Amino acid sequence: MYDTNSSNKVIKFISQYYYTYDHFLITDPDSSDYLYNFSSKNELLEITPPEQDEEHLWKGIEFLKELLLDFYSTDFIKSHFPYSIILVDEMADPVFGLPANCYTGRYFCCVTIQDMDNMSPEEKAFYSAELHEAIWFQIGLYEENFLDLPDGFFTIS
């Protein structure tokens, strides 16, 4: 599966992502990628896998890079990003059942790529903020002492 010399740019990027970050970028998800997710069962999360067209997937990868990955260093992604990022065409939030752009669990982050071509710059900025918020929420929730603030930070001035 992993081939950093592949002529298929999607397979090549997925391979490079794995070897660079020791994490997975999943473009053809099935329920085993998010349902049990190592520690808990996410049986309410509903996704529609992305269309398995190389150009569609490549645009999704570029979208992910532009809105999220390019903001962080290799070391940061290796140390703090979820074990897998899962690209999907559609997703329903497991709490409210409404369409969602992204969803994180302890070891994964699902990112929708279906309507990426139709987004205005403002919508892209909002989507990017949602992705960053989801990643930082996941980091804050699951990593002890990630952000070590001095006691003085909490005093009211």
Q: In which residue ranges do the predicted regions lie?
A:
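Acidic/polar, low-complexity intrinsically disordered N-terminal segments immediately downstream
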Residues: M1-T74
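Active-site recognition of the HExxH zinc-binding catalytic motif
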Residues: F108-S157
